């Protein structure tokens, strides 16, 4: 969250709400009935963590309200009734979700005006693709989607959505580590695994080859220190975890990988504009931050596309926040302020 016109968000925190697992016995300790974001993260050992957004759709509106309240009053320290608000959502989200979001903003927070933008379109803004043409693969915590955009317009019938993203990768890593005898089961422990994934995971250019390397040498092994001081070593897990993006069948999902879904989305478009889309594949979102993902994506799409086609995968360094940055650009345009 932040202010229009800024080049980076002022506040970045996980959208989690934590409630104490046990009732407080010591009076006057200032215990709260709910903690949000970083505070929930730091006290996670005594809390049960809830994720009010699942697969890009808000599933618990009371908790969403807490998160927005925390954003306005604690993080940005603004009075919402004095500021128009730009919110974002995943494409193909249910209409009821947007309506409820609008209702809370106007009725609970009394905002003077609001606008809901599609995340992938904002990423294209942020990537500086001024032609407004390209295909965006936006993969966050709960959902990945492929959005072909032509001259600034998202093409709805060619949007493909994949309910596979960061949280599924974290769960997959938890499962792999459990096979090795490490127990990560609670919601708090899941956050430890997420941190491990973000710090150590990478995408292999050739998965089978990488497995061979992992078997024959310890060159890819890395240590990770748990909060209690215990050190665990992870090797093949580092690339097995994000491989799920390219092979969802590894976690039992009957879906095509992100490379195939990108290709399918391009193929749904007219022959005339496919060339522009192949030459402008833009990655965005936290789950595209794995080292090696752009090279692998390029390799896989080159194998699927016609041999004469020029493929270009763009992975802007700030892509973790490119949706927010695009929102900052859009919200500061005078044309939007007139709406």
UniProtKB/Swiss-Prot annotation:
Keyword Flavoprotein carried by entry: no
- GO CC, one annotated term: cytosol
SUPFAM superfamilies named among the record's database cross-references: Actin-like ATPase domain
Which EC main class describes this enzyme?
A: hydrolase
Task: Please verify whether the record's keywords include Membrane.
Answer: no
EC nos: 3.6.4.-
Q: Can you state which reaction this protein catalyses?
A: ATP + H2O = ADP + phosphate + H(+)
The processes (GO biological process) annotated in the record are: cell division
Q: Which UniProt keywords apply?
A: ATP-binding, Cytoplasm, Cytoskeleton, Hydrolase, Nucleotide-binding
Spell out the molecular function terms from Gene Ontology: ATP binding; hydrolase activity
Compartmental location: Cytoplasm, Cytoskeleton
InterPro entries noted in UniProt: Actin (IPR004000), Actin/actin-like_CS (IPR020902), Actin_CS (IPR004001), ATPase_NBD (IPR043129)
- Please give the superkingdom of this protein's source: Eukaryota
| Family indicated by similarity | Belongs to the actin family.
The task this protein performs is described as: Actins are highly conserved proteins that are involved in various types of cell motility and are ubiquitously expressed in all eukaryotic cells. Essential component of cell cytoskeleton; plays an important role in cytoplasmic streaming, cell shape determination, cell division, organelle movement and extension growth.
- Additional free-text comment from the UniProt record: There are at least 7 different actin genes in tobacco.
Would you tell me the protein name for this molecule?
Actin-54
Lineage of the source organism? Eukaryota, Viridiplantae, Streptophyta, Embryophyta, Tracheophyta
